[in-house]
Amino acid sequence: MKNESTTIDVPAESSSAMKGKAPLIGVARDHTTSGSGGYNRGLSIFDFLLRLAAIVAALAAAATMGTSDETLPFFTQFLQFEASYDDLPTFQFFVIAMALVGGYLVLSLPISVVTILRPLATAPRLLLLVLDTAVLALNTAAASSAAAISYLAHSGNQNTNWLPICQQFGDFCQKSSGAVVSAFISVVFFTILVVISGVALKRH
């Protein structure tokens, strides 16, 4: 008697079916990556717009303080009454510092554009975070010191016999105070920029 053998064919999963399953994982991964990239790109666009606004605020502060000179319409034979920002070292520092802040913001625009084109890149965002933090400190120092001098110009100090001058030099005080306000607006913009960079890096 011949031995009869039975062969059972187990259908193997075709290679085409295996290939059909593989992209599913890739698609899900790409979807997650694209979602994160889209969120970061939105932050980068907002970052760019904030930098434009901060440029206007910083340069306006420097220009306003730099053009705040005022000469009183009356004078004597030997004296001419004039108030100028360069009479006070603090206001001189303010003009220089805010000009530097505005210049940095202009130079940072190309880096901000890179973060828009490459929203998942870490290096440009980290560079902006470090530089923004340093320039924020400079901006805050300039605005705070100028605010103290502006307060003295408005109110004076009886303990040191510093008399207020804003009753005589109204235009000078008005322009210098406006420059200080503009500088603090720039501080707010910088603070938001630092927060944006931190959030974008955290999502990486």
UniProtKB/Swiss-Prot annotation:
Q: Name one GO biological process term.
A: cell wall modification
| GO cellular component, as recorded | Casparian strip; plasma membrane
Instruction: Please state where this protein is localized.
Output: Cell membrane
Please give the residue ranges for the topological domain Extracellular.
64-92, 147-178
Q: Could you tell me which residue ranges are on the Cytoplasmic side of the membrane?
A: 1-42, 114-125, 200-204
| Role this protein plays | Regulates membrane-cell wall junctions and localized cell wall deposition. Required for establishment of the Casparian strip membrane domain (CSD) and the subsequent formation of Casparian strips, a cell wall modification of the root endodermis that determines an apoplastic barrier between the intraorganismal apoplasm and the extraorganismal apoplasm and prevents lateral diffusion.
Which protein family is it in? Answer: Belongs to the Casparian strip membrane proteins (CASP) family.
What is the protein name stated in its UniProt record? Casparian strip membrane protein 2
Q: List the top taxonomic levels of the source.
A: Eukaryota, Viridiplantae, Streptophyta, Embryophyta, Tracheophyta
